[in-house]
């Protein structure tokens, strides 16, 4: 076990564990989005904008994980990496299914960040509260809204049933992101 950090101040062990947990969730999300992104890049799927959308999301999630790990070190916590679980699927079906998976995943990440915010509140850690509010919660809410909007539009054009709707969504909606 490593020695206690000399810079650690008002940083509870529960907060430290929560930061490591969320970093792992972000890495798992990154891994899943990478899988989805390259699924849509396959020659038999060929939806390039879906591919780009999910690969960019993968990169953002990896960046978030690194931000949490930097925060951990800045506060005098210890980074403890966990195994990154392989996604349950390798075949993502269609854009509607992929957006549903992404929306559910982002809602669970948002809940984990909210839970960590509560821990910070319970332990009177205004620095962590501010960090979570300004660096993550607003961005998560915006992403959840964007995914929800995409899902609504995919359902509207019956993308899961008709290939043309999914193709047009790929070209016209995701093409503008």
UniProtKB/Swiss-Prot annotation:
Tell me more from the record.
There are three types of ferritin subunits in amphibia: L, M and H chains. M and H chains are fast mineralizing; the L chain is very slow mineralizing.
- In this chain, Fe cation is annotated as bound at 26, 64, 106
Q: Which Gene3D superfamilies does the entry link to?
A: 1.20.1260.10
| Domain Ferritin-like diiron stretches | 9-158
Q: What does this protein do?
A: Stores iron in a soluble, non-toxic, readily available form. Important for iron homeostasis. Iron is taken up in the ferrous form and deposited as ferric hydroxides after oxidation.
Q: What are the protein's GO molecular function terms?
A: ferric iron binding; ferrous iron binding
Top-level taxon in the UniProt lineage: Eukaryota
User: Which family, according to the similarity comment?
Assistant: Belongs to the ferritin family.
Q: Keyword Iron, does the record have it? A: yes
List the GO terms this entry assigns under cellular component, sorted alphabetically. cytoplasm
User: Could you tell me what this protein is called?
Assistant: Ferritin light chain, oocyte isoform
User: Quaternary structure per UniProt?
Assistant: Oligomer of 24 subunits. There are two types of subunits: L (light) chain and H (heavy) chain. The functional molecule is roughly spherical and contains a central cavity into which the insoluble mineral iron core is deposited.
Q: Name one GO biological process term.
A: intracellular iron ion homeostasis
Which keywords does UniProt give here?
Iron, Iron storage, Metal-binding
Q: Which Pfam family, just one, is annotated for this protein?
A: Ferritin
